[in-house]
Regions:
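Flexible, glycine/small-residue-enriched loop-and-beta-strand segment within the central core
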Residues: 63, 67-71, 77-177
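Short Pro/Gly-enriched beta-strand edge/turn motifs at strand-loop
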Residues: 56-57, 79
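Terminal amphipathic alpha-helical/low-complexity segments used for targeting or macromolecular assembly
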Residues: 1-55, 144, 150-151, 155-171
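Long amphipathic N-terminal alpha/beta scaffold segment
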Residues: 51, 57-66
Length: 177
């Protein structure tokens, strides 16, 4: 069974991947079963996302808004409670072998008077639990990048130089990250 699972994982894009030999068959089944459920959920999502190239593993209670603005590569894992608000000028492009773990929020637009630019996530990227990516200016995440839990990225800051004006009246500065 381990040989088959190793082969499947390698076909999904994880070269030279080998399951730990100390895992029992029962433990392996307990790990694989939820992945099968996620793949079924992902299959339904891929019907609604027209720009999808491969298997999507979709967690529970995941919210993806503006699906027409998203393109997904091969073997993408989107964990439980992930929120992706993809409304932006250039959309959200997620590469191959990308994992976005639970409770992560990707927010591409805050107000509709000025849409966010867009987000590109490269290949072989891992985004840990509880991350926040605010896309106002263009955000580009390269290949082979790993974000630990709780990483936050902001591509916009409020101007605050005039002490006689409220901060929300002074505008914003956007800069790509």
């Amino acid at each position: 069974m381990k040989k088959i699972i190793n082969h499947i994982i390698q076909k999904l894009g994880r070269k030279d991947y080998t399951i730990d030999s100390s895992l029992s068959e029962l433990e392996l089944v307990r790990l694989i079963y939820p992945k099968l459920i996620q793949a079924i959920r992902g299959a339904f999502l891929s019907i609604r996302i027209k720009k999808s190239k491969g298997v999507i593993f979709l967690g529970k209670r995941t919210k993806i808004k503006f699906k027409s603005k998203i393109s997904l590569g091969k073997s993408v894992q989107i964990g439980d409670n992930v929120e992706i608000f993809a409304l932006s000028k250039n959309g959200v492009k997620i590469g191959n072998n990308v994992s976005i773990l639970k409770n992560t929020i990707i927010e591409c637009t805050g107000v509709i008077r000025q849409l966010g630019e867009g987000l590109i996530i490269g290949n072989n990227v891992g985004i840990g639990q509880n991350c926040f990516i605010q896309v106002r200016g263009q955000v580009n995440i390269g290949n082979n990048v790993i974000f630990g839990p709780g990483v936050s990225i902001f591509s916009e800051s409020h101007n605050y130089s005039n002490l006689k004006k409220y901060i929300n009246e002074q505008g914003e500065t956007r800069k790509g990250v």
